[in-house]
Amino acid sequence: MERYTFDDPAGLLKERMQLMNDTVRGDKKPKRIPICSQSRAFPLLDAGYSLLEAFCDYDKTYDAMARFQELYNYDFYTDYSRFSYLVTEALGGGGMVVDDGKGTINYVDELLLLDGEYDDLIEMGMDRFFFERVLPRKYGLGKGKTTEEALAMINKAMEEQHKLDAANAKMVKNFKEKYGLGKTTNASPCFYKTPVDVIECNLRGL
């Protein structure tokens, strides 16, 4: 399959932004409808990687996404890399269920705030409630572990989170400069599930 060439990324970015503005605002008829990818994990599989292989190697994730853009030339992505497998694994795992045989990913839906805990949340505050209730409930921290062991797991997860943040930042920067792709449609440069979830939204499940 022939790959697209990107000789004028800055001009292409300007064109893409104009297309999106015209389409969303409706002030004038767009030259064409911009194409937004919600491909999620498909670029990884399309590049011949297994899911776990790419989740555990951000260079492979980058290569797969770059190949995908060169083949299909989307105007926008809802996100580039949202998979925090190594982060949740450092906390004890269980956040993502990956089946390489079927090429599927499932997220475990959990109630992090139980029915009778609203008063506790108000009394304890979000930070204390998160560390004393949510982390043990979601990741098993504190169950059969010393405080030092639990803190070591949290530190490891934060290290993995920083690596994921750096990989995502690299992808956003390089894809803008090389392919003329703007910031993704999410408020943050790239959306991904983190161990410190947006728990205001996720406390009571998906």
Residue ranges: model-predicted function:
Residues 1-206:
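Catalytic cores of TIM-barrel enzymes
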